[in-house]
Amino acid sequence: MTFFKHKTSIIDKNCKIGKNTKIWHWTHISKNSIIGFNCNIGQNVFIGENVTIGNNVKIQNNVSIYEGVTIESNVFCGPSVVFTNVKYPVSTKKVLKKNYEKTLVQKGATLGANCTIICGNKIGKESIIGAGSVVTKKVNDFAVVIGNPAKQVGKIINGKKKNTI
């Protein structure tokens, strides 16, 4: 094994975990998921079936990533970030996996603590989602968004945030 797995974590069958990745306490990685190298998966994280996570990704504690989510390399997910995969869940109906909506988090994005990412959206590369934001639509590359619903308030230019409001 070329990665670290805490004894309380669970990794289901057919998962691929990259070299030097660390998986901490009470984390569950569901079947057929792929996690790249040099990742840090915090405590009490749930990763659903068929999720793909790139290299050098940091996922803080209490994050939920459901089937249909792809996270590219160099992404930061703050504590308690939640991804959804069904826009209108109903307890009395079974949702078929073919109806899951896909979410893509592109390279270098930062998701602040307690963000909720509604399914079917793309989070642009190098974008920043402020803590507590609820993302209900596409986030452009290099955008800074905050709020509920999240709205663009700035842009990253030459590595620095510039306000647009």
PLM regions: where:
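Flexible, glycine/small-residue-enriched loop-and-beta-strand segment within the central core
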Residues: 1-7, 23-123, 149, 154-162
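Short glycine/serine/threonine-biased micro-segments
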Residues: 16, 40, 110, 118, ...
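Compact Cys/His-rich metal-coordination microdomains
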Residues: 140, 165
